[in-house]
């Protein structure tokens, strides 16, 4: 009985992702990637001259401040960018 219980615990640990992993879109929205440890935000970067087309997408640790030329939009849920 102990062996069966131990086996179930090991299988559960192996099958489950014990740490939360964030997924963010790459530049092409249909392609996503799993963010590395410490990168807990997704972002989109736009040129201020054209706010309709993102220039860059990905994972980031801290959301940068927007400037006169570039706007950043950050979020923290899977594929939110």
Curated annotation (Swiss-Prot):
Cysteines engaged in disulfide bonds, as pairs: 24-42, 35-59, 63-74, 75-80
Q: What tissue specificity is annotated for this entry?
A: Expressed by the venom gland.
Q: Name one GO biological process term.
A: killing of cells of another organism
Q: Where is the signal peptide?
A: 1-21
Give one GO molecular function term. toxin activity
Q: Which domain of life is it from?
A: Eukaryota
Family of this protein: Belongs to the three-finger toxin family. Short-chain subfamily. Type IA cytotoxin sub-subfamily.
What quaternary structure, including any partners, is listed in this protein's UniProt entry?
A: Monomer in solution; Homodimer and oligomer in the presence of negatively charged lipids forming a pore with a size ranging between 20 and 30 Angstroms.
**In UniProt terms, what function does this protein have?**
Shows cytolytic activity on many different cells by forming pore in lipid membranes. In vivo, increases heart rate or kills the animal by cardiac arrest. In addition, it binds to heparin with high affinity, interacts with Kv channel-interacting protein 1 (KCNIP1) in a calcium-independent manner, and binds to integrin alpha-V/beta-3 (ITGAV/ITGB3) with moderate affinity.
Name assigned to this protein: Cytotoxin 1b
Q: Which organism is it from?
A: Naja atra
